[in-house]
Amino acid sequence: MESIKVCMNALCGAASTSGEWKKGWPMRSGDLASLCDKCGCAYEQSIFCEVFHAKESGWRECNSCDKRLHCGCIASRFMMELLENGGVTCISCAKKSGLISMNVSHESNGKDFPSFASAEHVGSVLERTNLKHLLHFQRIDPTHSSLQMKQEESLLPSSLDALRHKTERKELSAQPNLSISLGPTLMTSPFHDAAVDDRSKTNSIFQLAPRSRQLLPKPANSAPIAAGMEPSGSLVSQIHVARPPPEGRGKTQLLPRYWPRITDQELLQLSGQYPHLSNSKIIPLFEKVLSASDAGRIGRLVLPKACAEAYFPPISLPEGLPLKIQDIKGKEWVFQFRFWPNNNSRMYVLEGVTPCIQSMQLQAGDTVTFSRTEPEGKLVMGYRKATNSTATQMFKGSSEPNLNMFSNSLNPGCGDINWSKLEKSEDMAKDNLFLQSSLTSARKRVRNIGTKSKRLLIDSVDVLELKITWEEAQELLRPPQSTKPSIFTLENQDFEEYDEPPVFGKRTLFVSRQTGEQEQWVQCDACGKWRQLPVDILLPPKWSCSDNLLDPGRSSCSAPDELSPREQDTLVRQSKEFKRRRLASSNEKLNQSQDASALNSLGNAGITTTGEQGEITVAATTKHPRHRAGCSCIVCSQPPSGKGKHKPSCTCTVCEAVKRRFRTLMLRKRNKGEAGQASQQAQSQSECRDETEVESIPAVELAAGENIDLNSDPGASRVSMMRLLQAAAFPLEAYLKQKAISNTAGEQQSSDMVSTEHGSSSAAQETEKDTTNGAHDPVN
């Protein structure tokens, strides 16, 4: 059975067993007050007293900005600072004026401890501890080092209190810790009375980050070590260190790569440079490195899912809603905040960001930061350019005064401790190792995002310069001059074989004149003058004018140059033109060979061939395993080099299939053309014959007194080409049917005629018989 929770706000008193409960101010028991969603949101936005305690007493105004502050209320105890001369000031004004003092800090055990008012107390506390172990722990464990400083004055009160909560530390200790501590734990008895206020811990270089999610066992709970030692101009204020952002909506924990890396100097610069942000508290939320698609013209910025759900308004429809975001100059932009369903999840984007990114002059690799101003609650969009020089300037070593972490920043006021004696060579080596690792990570963050390298195709245009480099390298190779080659003949071709490898020669320029004569020009290594040599001369890597034995007049560097500066430029240009023409001719030959083999490319990729004796020969292809001989898949059909290995006269199965298909296509094309030509010729001939027949019909002259026979058809016995074509186009079944009907009618007509003739003949015989009988009958 679930227990009923009651809101700790006396004016609310909402009770429920379910729902989202938020954490409020710390109590003496060590727990945090449980607030309902409404009260918790007001507490997180620092307007709790303005909403619920507006009519109560205890309200005072800030001496600097006249902001109303509720004194004596536990919900506003971290929102104000007491002045020594009387009065109160808000935490923002106190931070700007540098009047943040070391007040009483509320520990989780509910006890109040006195604060330290000077650096001498800090020095005395540090004297009672093992400083060697302290430095050892801080330098080896970068996760809990000074670089993990939190800017707690810019965080929400609920998150400030949550950092000190006992149950929160238990939850964090139960989770794995990514950091490995090689030093002892820091929870020693002298530190119990060294507790300081949360706000003064902001610039402490030993500030830990207990809210960071870890992956390995976490050491024992550690309290703040020292306070009041603000490293002005030190390494801590210059390095962009990832800091855990404030708690967002729900319990979503952001990955460390999205943590804001804004520094104290940048916050102060923003407050002083832009007046519209001077009266507001800037809370860094998260940041994102722009990808190529984010900085492109698509106008869409992909947001981390956890960040969008934690700090942006909740949306339930994919269309989203318009979101107003200000840039650091105060200009307001309206973006469409929406999401896309993606594998039972969501991908949140901001659409319409191209004008804003272009106004900031951002590109791929730059970082976009998102912050919130309090108490207005407006979203602010900033940026940080990615420059390689920034990361290098961060880590110049500890020789510079402003980067010496352990010489200026940690020197106590009493001067009893000599920090230089405590740092030995091994500690300095560890410091250098840590700085190198930080430099490497910073370089990884600021690297420019570009297109990934692709595999170069050897016959494509992408490697044109590479191929030229190969040809030039071939020109530099010379046969060794100390040995003589042995010549052997292979297939009517003479080859020179050397026992020693080739050597590199000097690069020369070859020029072809208009007459067809080729010249070789070489530059002296001593004087830089150009000398002309025969084409067949091979030069060593080092050559000077004194080596020019073929031309005694040019065998000295004091001899005048054979080419003027203008002629030298012409020579270089002609040499490049000569190489370009040679490369173009080789490419033309390659294209011609590819066109010639395009028809048989598939046949050349045949897998198997069957010989006359039935033996199977497998061609050299990129056939993958477990495919039997004769497989015709796309992988097995492709030869290793992408070109065919079969001859045009090959009779393998694939080659024959390709040739047969080609012959079939050509035959169909030829038959189609012949049929079209025949039909055109027949049509033209029929038209000509019809005209001739019409013109050649004889005129029938009727004699006087003769009548016209209307049943006669003068053209019935004449046969024309049109009637033949119509008869040929007449369907066969209809023709046979009509022929059968006509035959049947003719047979019936002939049978009727025979029966009629038979009847008439029998009647005539009977009449003749009667007549005969009557003639022979005697008269009675």
UniProtKB/Swiss-Prot annotation:
Q: Note down the stretches annotated as region Disordered.
A: 577-608, 669-695, 743-780
Taken from the UniProt entry, a GO cellular component term is: nucleus
**What Gene3D superfamilies does the annotation carry?**
3.30.40.100, DNA-binding pseudobarrel domain (2.40.330.10)
Zinc finger feature spans (CW-type)? 515-565
Q: Cite the binding residues for Zn(2+).
A: C524, C527, C545, C557
Gene Ontology MF terms in the entry: DNA-binding transcription factor activity; transcription cis-regulatory region binding; zinc ion binding
What the entry lists under SUPFAM superfamilies is as follows: DNA-binding pseudobarrel domain (SSF101936)
Q: List the disulfide bonds.
A: none
**Example GO biological process term?**
regulation of DNA-templated transcription
Q: Where is the composition biased (Low complexity)?
A: 674-686
Keywords from the named record: DNA-binding, Metal-binding, Nucleus, Repressor, Transcription, Transcription regulation, Zinc, Zinc-finger
* Principal subcellular localization: nucleus
- DNA-binding region residues: the ranges are 286-387
Annotated Polar residues bias:
584-603, 743-765
| Parts of the chain that traverse the membrane | none
- Give the location in the cell: Nucleus
PANTHER family registered for this protein in UniProt: B3 DOMAIN-CONTAINING PROTEIN OS07G0563300, B3 DOMAIN-CONTAINING TRANSCRIPTION REPRESSOR VAL2
What the protein does?
A: Transcriptional repressor of gene expression involved in embryonic pathways, such as LEC1, ABI3, and FUS3. Repressor of the sugar-inducible genes involved in the seed maturation program in seedlings. Plays an essential role in regulating the transition from seed maturation to seedling growth. Functionally redundant with VAL1/HSI2.
Entry protein name: B3 domain-containing transcription repressor VAL2
Give the gene that encodes this protein.
VAL2
